[in-house]
Amino acid sequence: MAAVLSPITRQVSKEPRELQRVCVDIRLEDVQDCLVYDRRGGSVPFKNLYQHTKSVIIFVRNFLCYACKEYVEDLSKIPEDVFEGKVLGIRLIVIGQSMHHHIEAFCTLTGYPYEIYVDPDRHIYQKLGMKREETFTDSAQPSPHVKSGIFAGQMKSIWRAMTGPIFDFQGDLHQQGGAIIVGPGAQVHFCHFDTNRLDHMPINWLLQLAGVQQTLDFSKPKIMHV
């Protein structure tokens, strides 16, 4: 009997002209039973996030990281009707690595209205193989979603840590994040692991890889409905 292969996805480079694909082995079975926690501290198995639908799952470095904050601010600009189309049925999920009591403040700060969980022990980060150091290259493209420079951004992060109601750094400062598109079931469609704080996958690319045809303009401010 032939061996059953682990689900394999594609890591997509962010070259502007051509998408070059390299196979990456993603073992969902290693993380499917890991617990993630919602803003109330309730736990759910990781597999519940993608078992019945296709999910775009974004792992951020930590909630104090200025680059992650600005990236999630742009995620908050995605109109709800992009995901509400029943033909697509896509879930957008952010996962951080802080304690659950930081979720509410982060959502208030960024205006992020969609699903968010935390993996405080970084079990999923580690088992999926996300990096725990930063690598910068001369050829790296700047993130279209991060507006602050490194020095100013770091000062903002330190200030938020010092003035927050609970002084801590809300996760491992060296841990990098990534993005995966998975589901329904064990299907793995795409994977990108960040090499540094500015290496987020452009949101429009993620949406298109998930099947969304609409292209969004993230240079515009978020529209608030009252």
UniProtKB/Swiss-Prot annotation:
PANTHER family: PEROXIREDOXIN-LIKE 2C (PTHR28630:SF3), PTHR28630
Family under the similarity heading: Belongs to the peroxiredoxin-like PRXL2 family. PRXL2C subfamily.
Name the UniProt record assigns to this protein: Peroxiredoxin-like 2C
SUPFAM superfamilies tied to this protein: Thioredoxin-like
Alphabetical list of Gene3D superfamilies matching this protein: Glutaredoxin (3.40.30.10)
CDD domains: PRX_like2 (cd02970)
Pfam family, one: AhpC-TSA_2
Domain of life: Eukaryota
Origin species: Takifugu rubripes
